[in-house]
């Protein structure tokens, strides 16, 4: 069974790496990596996996590869 997590990404942030949870359950993830060549997506995947306590191999980007609002599938 898989779960979907909605994430708002803030790439190139001086605040990161950091995960914040909004009242509606949406996660905001701040990463220092810029959104170039998938570096920010890779950093978000690793940080989200650590936040959820699962291996990074179980976290898959479902949609939003080039958007700031992303959906990740956790298997």
UniProtKB/Swiss-Prot annotation:
Signal peptide: none
Superkingdom in the source lineage: Bacteria
Coiled coil: none
Stored InterPro entries: DUF167, YggU-like_sf
SMART domains, per database record: DUF167
HAMAP family in alphabetical order: UPF0235
Similarity comment text for this entry: Belongs to the UPF0235 family.
Protein name (database record): UPF0235 protein MSMEG_3845
Organism phylogeny: Bacteria, Bacillati, Actinomycetota, Actinomycetes, Mycobacteriales
């Amino acid at each position: 069974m898989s779960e979907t997590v909605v994430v708002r990404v803030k790439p190139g942030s001086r605040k990161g790496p950091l995960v914040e949870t909004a009242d509606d359950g949406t996660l905001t993830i701040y990463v220092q990596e810029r959104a170039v060549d998938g570096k920010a997506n890779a950093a978000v995947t690793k940080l989200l996996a650590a936040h959820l306590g699962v291996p990074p191999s179980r976290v898959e980007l479902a949609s939003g590869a080039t958007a700031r609002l992303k959906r990740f599938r956790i298997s």
